[in-house]
């Protein structure tokens, strides 16, 4: 395919099961390399980037998200271990997670069990979106990552992205 995405642009990639949507986004983070042609990010072939440097610029949130045993603060900080409580809370607001977190008795100090089985699928997705945002990526990839949230919440997440992180691709 021939595709050009400008910095700060939001696009959607649609297609049937097995059409290559997930494969395409995985190429951006060099989970594997293209075998023909080239993939450019910032005008440079992704193969020229140090993998760590490239991956520091890209955050991916997948449909099947992973949460770890620990508090909500600890889970979100996997995106940036040096983040302040305020930074964690800010990204949770953008991801529409702050509302339900505030309802937990221990709020951000609520313990999440391994795999996140003590929160709903939609809550898990929003916490993982918050984690990805905390990294402050230049490229944010959402691979069917709001499939478990209702349409109103999905719209609020997208609105927050447009207003608060307009330069993120």
Residue ranges and their predicted role:
Residues 1-169:
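ABC-type nucleotide-binding domain
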């Amino acid at each position: 395919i021939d595709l050009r995405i400008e910095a700060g642009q939001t696009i959607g990639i649609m297609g049937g099961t097995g059409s290559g949507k997930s494969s395409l986004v995985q190429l951006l983070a060099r989970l594997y390399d293209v075998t023909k042609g080239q993939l450019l990010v910032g005008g440079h072939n992704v193969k020229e980037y140090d993998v760590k440097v490239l991956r520091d610029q890209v955050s991916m949130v997948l449909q099947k998200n992973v949460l770890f045993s620990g508090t909500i603060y600890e889970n979100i900080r996997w995106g940036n271990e040096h983040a302040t409580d305020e930074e964690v809370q800010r990204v949770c607001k953008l991801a529409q997670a702050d509302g339900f977190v505030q309802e937990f008795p221990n709020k951000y100090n609520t313990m999440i069990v391994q795999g996140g089985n003590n929160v709903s699928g939609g809550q898990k997705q929003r916490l993982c979106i918050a984690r990805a945002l905390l990294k402050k990526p230049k490229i944010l990839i959402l691979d069917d990552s709001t499939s478990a949230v209702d349409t109103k919440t999905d719209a609020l997440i997208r609105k927050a992205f447009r207003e608060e992180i307009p330069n993120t691709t």
